[in-house]
Amino acid sequence: MAVANPTTEQAILSEMRKQNRDRRALRFWLGFVLLALFCLVLVGGATRLTNSGLSITEWKPIHGVIPPLSAAEWEEEFRLYQRIPEFQQLNSSMTVDEFKGIFWWEWAHRLIARAIGVIFALPLIYFWLTGRIEKRLRWPLVGILALGGLQGGIGWWMVSSGLSVRTDVSQYRLATHLVMACLIFAGCMWIMRGLSRHSDDPPPTRSSRGFAAAIAIFSLFQIYLGALVAGLDAGFSYNTWPLMDGAVIPSDLLIQQPFWINAFENPKTVQFIHRIGAYTLFALTLINMVIALRAAPWTTHARRAILLFVLVTLQAAIGIATLLMQVPLHWGLLHQAGALVVFGFAVANWRGFYGEYPHGTMIAERD
């Protein structure tokens, strides 16, 4: 019978303790990034809800950090805004002081985005150079950083759609911008969750992991639909619930031709589809909870299923309240925040079925 080498065991334990310390540091960093991303999405939502997104008409990645500091600079910034259709057709009576109100939202949104790039890139470089990032995570983290750079380009692509002909941004580009933000958020959540300890409870059923994936993906699709609602101001189309214009299925959902374009450009149809998406997500999380409670009651997986259902139910209630009150700013932002919370938890729940990343020493022993 082989006798374990005490020196080898001590070396393994020492390496595992170091990895655990490194993982705690990475979790703290990624958690801070997630919080910053959450704030960025909320400020972006406020920018949209206050119609502030076209107030800055130029893309200045570096010196755009500095806002106008003098009356002359404010006049110049306002003059640039006066050139676009939004001002000419909708805000022609706006004063410089009123312009400042919409300018600060867009400026804050861009500033936070730049700041996130810094708080992601600099620690990534530091952790990489000091050997604190496990090899399996290096390129996924670089990929997230690259997506962040791409997201900046998508943001300007979105803004540019409202600078020449339209008086607002394209709902398609707005949805792309929000979905990309959610994908970056999901990537950080996925890695952070993998660096955390997991329960040893077995999945309730063999299909639990796939069902969790379906819920997370559908949550993202529902956010995409919500972005179309925001882009088309579709939240103002029907402000009643549960009926729409006194009917379960309104009569004017397919008035545009070709008929399929209604799903993307008819505000009433877009709101209808978003409602159906909410009912579907509610049903999916309810079924998931019932299955988990029946197959594996009081396990970690069952508790997560309960919490996910509760979050979706609260989000649905917030959505209904927002609709009935005709989308006041604070309720609209609460609804957007709830969407990101639901999606983030759905991703964490999905990742929970894969377990913690194995330690390097465990891999070496297995090999």
UniProtKB/Swiss-Prot annotation:
Pfam families in alphabetical order: COX15-CtaA
Transmembrane feature ranges: 25-45, 111-131, 139-159, 174-194, 210-230, 276-296, 305-325, 327-347
Cofactor(s) the protein needs: heme b
Single GO MF descriptor: metal ion binding
Reactions catalysed, as given in the entry: Fe(II)-heme o + 2 A + H2O = Fe(II)-heme a + 2 AH2
Cell membrane recorded as keyword: yes
Pathway: Porphyrin-containing compound metabolism; heme A biosynthesis; heme A from heme O: step 1/1
Subcellular location per the Swiss-Prot or TrEMBL entry: Cell membrane
Keyword DNA-binding: no
An individual GO BP term: heme A biosynthetic process
UniProt entry keywords in alphabetical sequence: Cell membrane, Heme biosynthesis, Iron, Membrane, Metal-binding, Oxidoreductase, Transmembrane, Transmembrane helix
Chain's role: Catalyzes the conversion of heme O to heme A by two successive hydroxylations of the methyl group at C8. The first hydroxylation forms heme I, the second hydroxylation results in an unstable dihydroxymethyl group, which spontaneously dehydrates, resulting in the formyl group of heme A.
Name recorded for this polypeptide: Heme A synthase
Source organism of the structure: Rhizobium johnstonii (strain DSM 114642 / LMG 32736 / 3841)
